[in-house]
């Protein structure tokens, strides 16, 4: 009997999840890819991995030189 109740509970969870998912707006993968590509091309100039930060503006560069003796 408990096995049957567990299956019913699982089916109810599945139905509730499907009710939530039915209202999700969807788009074609080709449209999403085109929008992503356009976004990347638009913001490429601001991306430090695509356009390196000039050394003078790099906040992570070493501030002073030092010598390590071995």
From Swiss-Prot:
Positions bearing Cysteine methyl ester: 67
Gene Ontology CC annotations of this record: heterotrimeric G-protein complex; plasma membrane
BP-aspect Gene Ontology terms: cellular response to pheromone; G protein-coupled receptor signaling pathway; nervous system development; nose development; social behavior
Residues with lipidation of kind S-geranylgeranyl cysteine: 67
Residues in the signal sequence: none
Propeptide intervals in chain numbering: 68-70
SUPFAM superfamilies tied to this protein: Transducin (heterotrimeric G protein), gamma chain
Keywords attached to this entry: Cell membrane, Lipoprotein, Membrane, Methylation, Prenylation, Transducer
Membrane topology value: Lipid-anchor
Role summary: Guanine nucleotide-binding proteins (G proteins) are involved as a modulator or transducer in various transmembrane signaling systems. The beta and gamma chains are required for the GTPase activity, for replacement of GDP by GTP, and for G protein-effector interaction.
Subunit structure: G proteins are composed of 3 units, alpha, beta and gamma.
Family statement drawn from the similarity comment of this UniProt entry: Belongs to the G protein gamma family.
Name used for this protein in its record: Guanine nucleotide-binding protein G(I)/G(S)/G(O) subunit gamma-8
Source organism: Homo sapiens (Human)
Taxonomic classification: Eukaryota, Metazoa, Chordata, Craniata, Vertebrata
Gene, per the UniProt record: GNG8
């Amino acid at each position: 009997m408990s096995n049957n109740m567990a299956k019913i509970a699982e089916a109810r969870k599945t139905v509730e999840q499907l009710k939530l998912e039915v209202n999700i707006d969807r788009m074609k993968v080709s449209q999403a890819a085109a929008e992503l590509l356009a976004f990347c091309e638009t913001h490429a100039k601001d991306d430090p991995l695509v356009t390196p930060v000039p050394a003078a503006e790099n906040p992570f560069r070493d501030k002073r030189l030092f010598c390590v003796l071995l």
